[in-house]
From Swiss-Prot:
Coiled coil: none annotated. It comes from the Bacteria. This is Phosphatidate cytidylyltransferase. It is a multi-pass membrane protein. GO terms for molecular function: phosphatidate cytidylyltransferase activity. Pathway: Phospholipid metabolism; CDP-diacylglycerol biosynthesis; CDP-diacylglycerol from sn-glycerol 3-phosphate: step 3/3. The chain crosses the membrane at residues 33-53, 67-87, 95-115, 133-153, 167-187, 206-226. Its EC number is 2.7.7.41. Belongs to the CDS family.
Length: 231
């Protein structure tokens, strides 16, 4: 009994430590990408290319060098990142890209906080045992709120009407947040399939590059599609 309680206590301490590390990593990553997007665009391109290389490398290692899965990786990783680079090549989309990263990263952080705080039913226990429905809902609503608050910044401007209207913005942000979580589960499925917990350990609190940027896989195409509706 004492040993069991000790293990549970250590597990909780580890989870709390991972949460702090994840928040600290976000504090470093978010400003870095904001600066790159708004003022140092070549740096943003370099960062995204490095992200693509890192994701592909980890995907290759994770799937045990399987040719079939490598081909899947060559589709689901370069294409979404290319779409983000294409969108960011137009300066008028600077705020759009920055908002996008704030949404997909905030849902991840707040989903983890909500899940740890509220607990409750598991979202997909066989794929990602730690995810909960309470965390999902908390993350989605928080991401929508974060995006709405960002829209009050005086210099905030997105040409697309669906992003400049705060009601639509909240709905789109929640949609992207939900998709980000689905994208996370999508990659988690493959990690479970190949018996891997994290794709790497390069980013404290997150694991590998693929663990941190897996939300791009499904959300970037949706962002590109929605942005194109009004153009």
């Amino acid at each position: 009994m004492i040993i069991q309680k000790g293990k549970e206590h250590l597990a909780k301490d580890k989870q709390k430590s991972n949460l702090y590390l994840r928040i600290l990593s976000g504090i470093v990553l978010v400003p870095s990408f904001v600066v790159a997007i708004l003022w140092l665009k070549p740096l943003f391109y370099v960062l995204m290319i490095l992200v693509a290389i890192g994701m592909l490398s980890e995907w290759y290692d994770m799937t045990h060098s399987s040719i079939m899965y490598l081909l899947i990786g060559l589709i689901i990783i370069p294409i979404p990142i290319s779409l983000l680079i294409f969108l960011s090549s137009n300066p008028i989309n600077n705020w759009l890209i920055m908002l996008y990263f704030c949404i997909v990263w905030s849902v991840d952080i707040f989903a983890m906080i909500g899940g740890k705080t509220l607990g409750g039913a598991k979202l997909a226990p066989k794929i990602s045992p730690k995810k909960t429905w309470s965390g999902l809902i908390t993350g989605i609503l928080s991401a929508g709120l974060v995006a709405t608050l960002i829209s009050f910044i005086p210099s905030f401007y997105i040409e697309n009407y669906y992003f400049s209207n705060r009601i639509y913005l909240f709905i789109i942000s929640c949609t992207l947040a939900l998709t980000a979580q689905l994208s996370d589960l999508f990659i988690s499925y493959f990690k479970r399939k190949f018996n891997i917990k994290d794709s790497g350990n390069i980013i404290p609190g997150h694991g590998g590059v693929l663990d941190r940027f897996d939300s791009i896989i499904l959300t970037a195409p949706i962002l590109f599609f929605i942005n194109g509706l009004y153009l």
